Amino acid sequence: IPNKNDFSMVSCQFCVHYYFENEMKLRTLIQNVSDNITMGGYFIGTCFNGKNIFNMLKSNKLVEGKIDDKVIWKIEKDYKIRTFNEEKPNFGQKIKVYIDSIGETHTEYLVNFTYFEKIMKKYGFELVEYKGFEQYYVDFEKDNINNKNGNKNKNKNMKELSQDEKELSFLNYSFVF
């Protein structure tokens, strides 16, 4: 990297959960972002909503989605906490995630976004937007139904998501700081 603070945007897509293994990893990520983003720049990303996954796994050790009896994703609880306290960081809360298109299971960690926002503020970042993929889907559907021509803009080749695909997708949120 040529100079610090050279980037107007830093992107971290589908990987923040790895930094929730421990505090040092998370602080290293945030320090790296802070060191390399220009004043007024944006830090954008996507991650699972850890609280939603925690709630999903409250009564089951494993949840999965299928299409035609084939498992397309599964999330397995590998932690012992019984409550998800948003005021605490909750580092190291492992889940095992399998996504068919990736083809293997990976260890990930629950993201406590409330804590993430709080620690980002300490580094001078303000949350601009935190939005669930479900809301993007609703907005997209509404735009397709209510466009000016009264015709759906939907690409005829676009496949409709199954309920199980939606369930996995809707666990994701985007953020902008």
Give residue spans per PLM region.
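SAM-dependent methyltransferase
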Residues: 46, 50-123, 128-130
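Core SAM-dependent methyltransferase catalytic element
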Residues: 123, 157-177
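Alpha/beta-hydrolase-fold catalytic nucleophile elbow
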Residues: 13, 44-47
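Short amphipathic alpha-helical segments embedded in low-complexity Lys/Glu-rich regions
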Residues: 25-29, 48-51, 60, 133-140
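A short glycine-rich, Lys/Arg-flanked "PGG" loop and its adjoining helix->strand segment in the class I
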Residues: 17, 24-39
